[in-house]
Amino acid sequence: AEKIKICLQKQVNSSFSLHNGFGGNLYATEEKRMFELVKPKAGASVLNQSTWIGFGDSRTDKSNSAFPRSADVSAKTADKFRSLSGGSLMLSMFGPPGKVDYLYQGCGKHKVFYEGVNWSPHAAINCYRKNWTDIKLNFQKNIYELASQSHCMSLVNALDKTIPLQATAGVAKNCNNSFLKNPALYTQEVNPSEEICGKEYLAFFTLPTQFGTYECKLHLVASCYFIYDSKEVYNKRGCDNYFQVIYDSYGKVVGGLDNRVSPYTGNSGDTPTMQCDMLQLKPGRYSVRSSPRFLLMPERSYCFDMKEKGLVTAVQSIWGKGRESDHAVDQAYLSTPGCMLIQKQKPYIGEADDHHGDQEMRELLSGLDYEARCISQSGWVNETSPFTEEYLLPPKFGRCPLAAKEESIPKIPDGLLIPTSGTDTTVTKPKSRIFGIDDLIIGLFFVAIVEAGIGGYLLGSRKESGGGVTKESAEKGFEKIGNDIQILRSSTNIAIEKLNDRISHDEQAIRDLTLEIENARSEALLGELGIIRALLVGNISIGLQESLWELASEITNRAGDLAVEVSPGCWVIDNNICDQSCQNFIFKFNETAPVPTIPPLDTKIDLQSDPFYWGSSLGLAITTPISLAALVISGIAICRTK
């Protein structure tokens, strides 16, 4: 009789690379990074399509006769905007004669403002003031600030009021022989003489707690008054000084000008200029007192419910060639914390005409058609990778990637995978379940700055019955990491709060601190990914070894008395009793695959974040996969020895 020895043998050559893991190592034909770097797309986007609203003009007005050529947004996005061609929030606030007057109102956690160009130097609105840019800047700034703290907002276009019986609605020659709708001008007579004295006016207006279905917790009110260069310009008879003052219900001054206590400008002009300050006032009854001859009466406001903090995106609104624009929207953005600005890099060139349908703006606003994982001043991201090449400029919201270098991202094995352990490690089934991917899927792995010793938490103890990290030791390691991270995170947050109090006046210091924190988080996350990578490698290696054990057991069962297992993964067979076809049945399974390979492991990593905590990531969870392809035992060959 001729006896031969047949063994399982790993086929590994120089094309394989070695990967070390916690509890087991393996060879692989390929490798890939756990994540690729993502690049933000320039422009605006939203985190949730169902929770945003836009406020616009002709460039977002679906009812415009030239739509869609006149628009800078898609038809889908235009449906989300409250728009009317020729309108703007400020035009509706003041109501200058001959201009569009639109009732702006709506609700959304994220508000996108693409309007403002219709009140610009090109509009040439006078009404006792030729340049309204500084008032527009203050108006837009207050709108953005209050919108960021509210879910709903609405124009209140008719305040309840009580005015003196002798007052008459006034007009002005330099206001197209009319006047603004807000404030309204009331006079003792049409075109009152500068020589009239008389008694002071006393009037009242009420800011409502509700306007239609809109709740009002705070109102934006324009407190307007005239600025005179001298007392003689105000009244040639000099019978009194000019004043126009607003009082709350307790008699406290909340706005206006009183030349009885404040000096005149001292300039040489003979025509007054109207100034309008923006006041944030609570609902209630207010009084207005003014010197004789006329009264400027608040007639409108913007109402805000102040129910929740939200996101504000301001889009630069400028004319095309031949029309003068201002930069009030851009400057208001700079003055409003948490506000994002979408800004053109090229002149506005329209498709429908010079001022409607700009291709660059369409590209910048195309992201409003989608939901992003992260929105920031640098742009928006919808890929799932936690890393980007460049630091994303704040403000940023959502699950925002952290800056990292490509070479610092850990690599995982791919392609054909072979465990490094010999077949002796596959003979005995492990007595206790090895810590595996299912355990990783269950938990949330908090990311923070871990000072030292993190690897030692996970090494655990090796078992003679198969090796690797036991479930119990790994769980204890993760529990220790979690506790340490929570303590460190809590201490860090307390320190940040204290530091913010000290440097709240220093915006650059805050930005520097934010950058340092994000860099630390990026380093910590990369460190945690390295640990997870090592766990995955070990887990895969163990899984492959178990498949080898199943293969060896199946061979022994099929052989019966025809083959004797003389060592782990090796059998002796009588060549005269078991011919080639017999051996093919036992060892090659008649060229079939009777033992299923281990299923692909799902190892997709998903960042969980708090959108209002520095805009960066707070947690890490393992979910469903980058498939680790080809986890097979096809690299196992049969080696014959005589």
Swiss-Prot record:
In natural infection, inactive HEF is matured into HEF1 and HEF2 outside the cell by one or more trypsin-like, arginine-specific endoprotease. GO terms for molecular function: host cell surface receptor binding; sialate 4-O-acetylesterase activity; sialate 9-O-acetylesterase activity. Residues 138-297 are annotated as: N-acetyl-9-O-acetylneuraminic acid binding. The chain crosses the membrane at residues 618-638. It is a single-pass type I membrane protein. Residues 353-638 are annotated as: Fusion domain-2. Glycans are attached at N13, N48, N131, N382. GO terms for biological process: fusion of virus membrane with host endosome membrane; fusion of virus membrane with host plasma membrane; symbiont entry into host cell; virion attachment to host cell. This is Hemagglutinin-esterase-fusion glycoprotein.
